[in-house]
A protein has these predicted regions:
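Class I SAM-dependent transferase core
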Residues: 34-93, 97
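Class I SAM-dependent methyltransferase SAM/SAH-binding core
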Residues: 99, 103-155
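Helix-to-beta-strand junctions that scaffold the AdoMet/dcAdoMet cofactor pocket
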Residues: 116-117, 175-176, 189-191
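A short acidic, Gly/Pro-enriched loop at the edge of an enzyme's catalytic core
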Residues: 156-165
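A short SAM/SAH-binding and catalytic strip from SAM-dependent methyltransferases
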Residues: 164-178
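A short glycine-rich, Lys/Arg-flanked "PGG" loop and its adjoining helix->strand segment in the class I
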Residues: 179-194
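Conserved class I S-adenosyl-L-methionine
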Residues: 196-221
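Core SAM-dependent methyltransferase catalytic element
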Residues: 231-251
Length: 251
């Protein structure tokens, strides 16, 4: 009888160990893994620049925290990236509403705002510290039509059908829940509204940016198609980045 009890205990222990090992080897089986509409993969062995979470075959990059705010405002940014060219090709109307998703310090938000004097810019970020910087700069620059919006990792928190154009500059590749965020953006867009993504060119090995912080046109199109957006054009006017334009269907 003692041997049988011991035998049962061994089998039970082995079973528990096997279940735990299966969770470690395939975290998507873990009960704590998100079960959203998107298919995410999780890998314990991954790039040190990523979070171990994969979407559409791409590892999601780590977020640049608010401690890197000075890099966003660096004096050399205009010469290196020529962001002034971005706002000049957006074809904005004076009363348009623009959502700057992953706005950071509001670098682009404050440059777009004067182009839409009768509209507004939603400066959206998940970090309260970044929004504090935006609020401070808004007062300093005396710009009234920039509205800071605190988002979550999965929701941009924008009013439905309120946005004419949503723009993401070197931000999308860091979204922890890209599918859910894009769903939120699409809900916020007016019919026919546009999405503009600016990302460093993954196709070019001479763009000296970490691999997970670059995206190819093919990958961007794949991910935008997955949420129902239509590609309209890619503008090759920036020295290191793609500028890709997508559109929400009219109906």
């Amino acid at each position: 009888m003692k041997f049988k009890l011991k035998d049962k205990f061994v089998f039970l222990t082995v079973g528990i160990v096997l279940i735990l090992c299966s969770w470690l080897l395939n975290p998507t089986l873990s009960p704590t893994a998100p079960t959203a509409g998107a298919t995410y993969e999780y890998k314990s062995i991954h790039s040190p620049d990523g979070i171990g979470k994969f979407y559409q075959g791409r590892e999601i990059a780590q977020v640049m925290g608010h401690t890197g705010a000075s890099w966003l405002e660096r004096p050399s940014r205009e010469a290196e990236e020529q962001p002034s060219k971005i706002r000049n090709v957006l074809n904005l109307k004076p009363n348009d509403v623009v959502a700057d998703i992953g706005a950071g310090t509001g670098y682009l938000s404050f440059r777009i705002a004067p182009l839409i004097p009768k509209g507004k810019v939603f400066a959206v970020d998940i970090q309260p510290e970044m929004l504090d910087i935006i609020k401070s700069l808004k007062k300093e620059k005396n710009i009234s039509n920039v509205e800071p919006i605190l988002a979550t990792e999965s929701n941009p928190n924008l009013p439905p059908e309120s946005v004419d154009l949503a723009i993401m500059v070197d931000a999308y590749h860091e979204f922890e829940y890209p599918f859910e965020v894009m769903q939120g953006i699409i809900k916020a867009l007016k019919p026919g509204g546009r999405v503009v993504l600016v990302e460093y060119r993954a196709e070019n090995p001479f763009v000296m940016i970490k691999a997970l912080h670059k995206m190819s046109q093919k990958q961007v199109k794949k991910e935008m198609q997955a949420v129902g957006l239509t590609w309209r054009e890619t503008k090759n006017l920036l020295p290191q980045q793609h500028l890709m334009v997508f559109e929400k269907p009219q109906t």
